Amino acid sequence: MKLEELLFTRISGADFGSVKLAQFDGKPGVFFGPCPEDTDRGWTDARQYPRISYGLDLRGDPDRQTAGTLYVDVWCTEDGPAPEDIEPTIRAVLCGVIMAPEEDAPCSFSWQASQTFRSSRETVVEKVIGVTVTFDMYAFPEQITSDPDPVLAMQKYFRENYPEITIIGRADLPDFTEPTEEHPAVYCRLESYELGREYRTVAWLEGTVICHIFAPGASSRARWIRAIVDDLSRRGEVIMMDTSPMFLRSIRADTTLDPLVHGQIHLKKATWGILKNPPYHHGINHIHTND
């Protein structure tokens, strides 16, 4: 599904408790873009409120390729359910979940603000009120390049040593991934790298690999971060896909950093080598065979 369809599925499938959304053509009144007119025949039982509309503004981001802002408007009437009764559920179903739209990078949303409003739109006898819930969107583009690849090496490390952790960036992610305390998620990216030591046969690259750890609650994230950092510190290296080592010369962890934006584990001065010359294989000349 595309991102707007994933958002519709997530919002329309939410449990709003005693609050029942208006129905339009037999479905919950959730719309991407403007809502239909109140006089539209699609409204069931002539009830148009409460209803929800949402819009998405995307922008380019040099670090994450895609970022954006999601606006969710909750529309109610003064004598019906209050917007404040619906807003917490909107936040709950959209925050802390990783969505994987088809043909696009996985993404997640972070709540930014909620602002009430009084609409100029009104019914015959009722005033229309509502709340606009704003979310920041962050994408998780695949950062795998060429072998030896430090991001691919870190994904291999997590896959082999922490099979309970979901790796963001794989092609087989489901539509929705909700990290839990027992099954968190991780996203690895290469922030920067440069040429370090150089020899006749090998060039050593030094870079910074950042790991974003996703789990509900600061305490559960802190436990996972501590466990991962302790294990990496004991190892001192991560084996890459070509079986060569990537040395970890500096590891910095900060549990207060936002996992969506900055990432909490910074592998600074991660060092890996690339061969300057491919291995030479002597050819065999003048082959003679006897039958």
What does each model-identified segment do?
Residues 1-10, 59-65, 106-164, 193-206, ...:
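Short, charged interaction patches at domain edges and termini
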Residues 84, 181-190, 195-199, 223:
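A structural signal for the main folded, soluble domain(s) of proteins
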Residues 1-63, 96-110, 140-192, 290-291:
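Small/polar-rich, solvent-exposed N-terminal microdomains that initiate assembly or binding
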Residues 67, 75-103, 147-148, 199-241, ...:
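Extracellular/virion structural assembly segments
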Residues 53-55, 73, 134-136, 189, ...:
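Residues in well-ordered beta-strands of folded domains
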Residues 38-39, 73-75:
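N-terminal export/ancillary region detector
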Residues 50-52, 133, 185-186, 209, ...:
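A broad, low-specificity signal marking well-ordered, structured residues that form hydrophobic/aromatic
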